[in-house]
Amino acid sequence: MSKTPADNHTPMMRQYFGLKSQHPNQLLFYRMGDFYELFYDDAKRASRLLDITLTARGHSGGIPIPMAGIPYHAAENYIARLVRMGESVVVAEQTGDPATSKGPVERQIARIVTPGTISDEAFLEEKRENLLLSLAHQSRKGLDIFGFSYLDMASGRFCLFEVDGHEALSSELQRLSPREILISEDFPARATLKLEKGISELGPWHFDYESSYRQLIQQFSTKDLSGFGCEAMTAAIASAGALLQYAKDTQRSALPHIQSIMVEHKDDSVLIDGATRRNLEIDINLTGGTSNTLVEVLDKCSTPMGSRLLKRWLHTPIRDLNEIQARQQVVAELQQNQSYNAFEAPLKKVGDLERILSRVALRSARPRDLLRLRFALEAAPEINGLLANATSERLQELNLRILAQPIITETLAKALVENPPSVVRDGGIFAKGYDEELDELLALSTNATDFLAEMERSEKARTGISSLKVGFNRVHGYYIEISRLHSDQAPVEYIRRQTLKNAERFITPELKAFEDKALSAKSKSLAREKELYEALLEQLNEILGELQTTSQALAQLDVLNNFAERANALSFTCPELHNRGGIQIVGGRHPVVESVISEPFVPNDLDLNDKRSLLMITGPNMGGKSTYMRQIALITLLAHTGCFVPAESASISVVDRIFTRMGSSDDLAGGRSTFMVEMTETANILNNASKNSLVLMDEVGRGTSTFDGLSLAWAAVDYLANKLKCYVLFATHYFELTTLADQLENAANVHLTATEYEDEIVFLHKVHEGPASQSYGLQVAQLAGVPRDVIGHAKQKLKELEVVTGIDLDTKTIETKANSSSIKAKTKEHLVKESKNGYQPQQVDMFAQAEQNALKNALEELDLDNMTPLEAISALYKLKSQL
């Protein structure tokens, strides 16, 4: 940006700087005739992002002005691209008349487009919510409290809640996946956001609690916020006030479609942290795509708003038994006789009613939006008829909330043409007969074609010039065109209007008089259409609340109808949810895996209860341990949404959280190793799980040395079983841990089976009681394509190591010989006792001490850091011979 005094700039550039100073961090589209121009740093940024030409427009203040421009008729495409990149755009339109302006044409900010406040259909992803999130921070009693508020501008859904701690902050950010985040300039957890784009920093005063409180009660026309249940959430209120003002500023509207605020309570839902969302691949797979996810399998909704609601339900499973059972009853009723099929066609007519109503409220709805609104309203009575004999209470409630609107539906049917234009300014919106004044004005424009044809015929006859044509263009208006060859034959009353390469264009007094009349009629008809259109929007806004109620009910019906269709198509059954404790599943399946594999999926059972709350899972790699664990979590999650589940039967006690620690990778940006990520996730589980939590842990301790990893895994299992007493599936390759089932009252071993056939491993994927007897590591390596020479060498080394460590090759079991120093032999007396603090593990001697001092001394003298593997093997043989 130029630093020269304002007086050194041209009047137009001074006008530009005045507008730009109001929005220094956003790209300013400055309308100049048929183009939007960007200057200085904005031009450079837009050139880089949009791959458009960067040029210069003269000088201002003695400095060349970098400039980039785009045609105004293509602006929406460019703005959409910028918004998808996380940029915000300010559009300045010409509001003055260039013909009468003495200085630069007057310009004003017409709209502000930011990633989180868009409502235009062209900018939105159909099946993804577009959330604007606001965060405020407070310190209370040594805790970091983060106030969340978020708004879906395209639907008017406005929510708030609070969490404490950076881990919860990160988890909620992943759940909501906002397009834009508002924070104060002094926000202390900026690094946790992990975003480069889509963050808007505001002055700290925007998050002032008192002004935010006033902002909210003014919006909802209430005396206070006690009716919303958020009076004590001061951080959340501060964030919500800042968000609401920001949304009003960008939309230049009072936001009439935002009529309430919903408070989210932690105890209402099953909490799922960020690691669990990743591992369960709810809507994003582990590689960042959307294929082979739970949503891809489940989402066969008929409306986009149903698809978005389904995703919300999956990300926020509920704990209210009454609500869960109400949903189940609807699914069961719709599943009977496949009655869900009858709803598919009328629901498809509804379309994205939710977002259409948002644009109606913001006065940005386009003519085709109103046509789709008409189709949606015409479907309502049909859906009411299908629900008339519903027996479940929830379906009866939904039927009452789906309100037919016969008056406005008839108005829309009479008003709109069958194929309205995409924008109001083009005209041609209203059907003939809707408005008498408009019909008269349109008749003048329509008659122009007949008039021009008749004039062309008569002038040809009068002048004898066969090449004469009568036409119209937007720049020069109406004209008579004669080829250059015959232009000298033009009558004297023809007035030359334009010279072309091969022709001359003329005007006559008669044609000029008609032009004035026709153009005036066109201008008046467009003005009348705009007037009628605004009146129609006003009429719709008078019943906006009722229309939103209908929209919400239709979205719920769509999701529940989808659940019924999926239950029938995928052989899902209704689970029993209760508060008695325990999780029992018969014939459970993984809903995503079974949809992508060609062979039949092998179902498995689960039995967790107070006396058997922890399962130690062993078995070969690729044997199905992770799939088994994930399917249990997904079945549990689905059950808490009211959806039927992939199992023969399921009885599930309501859980408060679902945790997973399954696989890790380096967090390079955060400077954390794989093991550090693993331990952070483990710590989160151990610190936050309760007796009613479901915990899935896979390969804890594998990222460090064997003894360190084994010790950590051992201690974690002990803590989960004795202190937390939650429901745990713990998969491991540390076979020493299987001895814990003999020592912990509430632990048991299960394993995934495999067998060898003609030197090849066959995975049976079936869960059986007891620990695994073999790991099949070399066979899996061979399947992976490891060279035969390497496999052969590994087998040789395995035999040497088995001799050293005392593993029996004949039986191929992991049991150690009687005289070996195994963990199992030294931990039979392991006991856990309750202390005053509730948990104190008794010290266990996991690693046997040498029985002879000489052997101990020999071990201590070994310089392990400087020994080769062969030297180490040789030393071990020598030591073994001394036993």
UniProtKB/Swiss-Prot annotation:
Keywords tagged on the record: ATP-binding, DNA damage, DNA repair, DNA-binding, Nucleotide-binding
Entries under Gene3D superfamilies matching the protein: 1.10.1420.10, 6.10.140.430, DNA repair protein MutS, domain I, MutS, connector domain, P-loop containing nucleotide triphosphate hydrolases
InterPro entries xrefs: DNA_mismatch_repair_MutS, DNA_mismatch_repair_MutS-lik_N, DNA_mismatch_repair_MutS/MSH, DNA_mismatch_repair_MutS_C, DNA_mismatch_repair_MutS_clamp, DNA_mismatch_repair_MutS_core, DNA_mismatch_repair_MutS_N, DNA_mismatch_repair_MutS_sf
GO CC term (a single one): cytosol
GO biological process: mismatch repair
One Pfam family, short name: MutS_II
First and last residue of the signal peptide: none
Keyword GTP-binding (UniProt): no
Keyword Signal: no
Cysteine pairs bridged by disulfides in the record: none
Residues engaged in binding ATP: G619, P620, N621, M622, G623, G624, K625, S626
GO molecular function (one): mismatched DNA binding
Tree of life domain: Bacteria
Protein task: This protein is involved in the repair of mismatches in DNA. It is possible that it carries out the mismatch recognition step. This protein has a weak ATPase activity.
Family as reported in the entry's similarity comment: Belongs to the DNA mismatch repair MutS family.
HAMAP family, sorted: MutS
Protein name per the record: DNA mismatch repair protein MutS
Gene: mutS
